Design a protein with these regions (language model features):
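Short, ordered, surface-exposed loop/turn motifs in non-cytosolic proteins
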Residues: 37-45, 50-52
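Extracellular beta-sheet/turn segments enriched in Thr/Pro/Gly and aliphatic residues
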Residues: 105-140
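Exposed aromatic-hydrophobic patches
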Residues: 70-76
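A short, amphipathic beta-strand motif
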Residues: 26-34
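Surface-exposed loops/turns
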Residues: 37, 78-79
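A short tyrosine-centered beta-strand micro-motif
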Residues: 82-86
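Bacterial Sec-dependent N-terminal signal peptides
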Residues: 1-25
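Acidic, glycine-anchored loop motifs typical of Ca2+
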Residues: 90-97
Length: 140
């Protein structure tokens, strides 16, 4: 009897432990179209809070442009509220170039195609809920 208990314990000790509390994560695919050129690359970020929007991304990526389009795939994102932004970094200096007045020289965009008005787009206009895998289209 002791042998059987030891064998069963040995078998179960090699099995992965799950507590039923694992969070499900999702994939967010962002497809950008309407870019002016294939020059440079796209700097994209996912933000999970209004505080730090456009400054401190939750997840980020850099992708190449093909046929004036780009696709960014963000994996392993928890369910919740997010916003996406990107810039078309034409000269690959990894920042948004602006003129003397602070107006962007390079194209940019946000989720929900949120627009800027006398300043950057607002988190409130760009936010969306993620509760399943999602594909988002952003057109310039």
């Amino acid at each position: 009897m002791k042998k059987i208990v030891l064998i069963i314990a040995f078998i179960f000790s090699g099995m992965p432990h799950t507590n039923g509390q694992e969070k499900e994560t999702y994939t967010l695919i962002v497809k950008i179209s309407g870019l002016k050129s294939n020059k440079g690359h796209i700097l994209a970020g996912v933000y999970n809070s209004e505080i730090g929007f456009l400054k401190n991304e939750y997840k980020g990526d850099v992708v190449e442009i093909k046929e004036k389009r780009a696709t960014i795939i963000f994996k392993n994102i928890d369910a919740g509220e997010y916003a996406v932004s990107f810039i078309h970094d034409e000269n690959k200096n990894n920042k948004m170039d602006t003129n003397f007045f602070g107006i962007p020289k390079e194209d940019y965009g946000c989720s929900n195609n949120a627009k800027s008005f006398l300043g950057p787009p607002k988190y409130e206009d760009a936010k969306f809920m993620l509760s399943e895998n999602k594909t988002m289209l952003i057109e310039l």
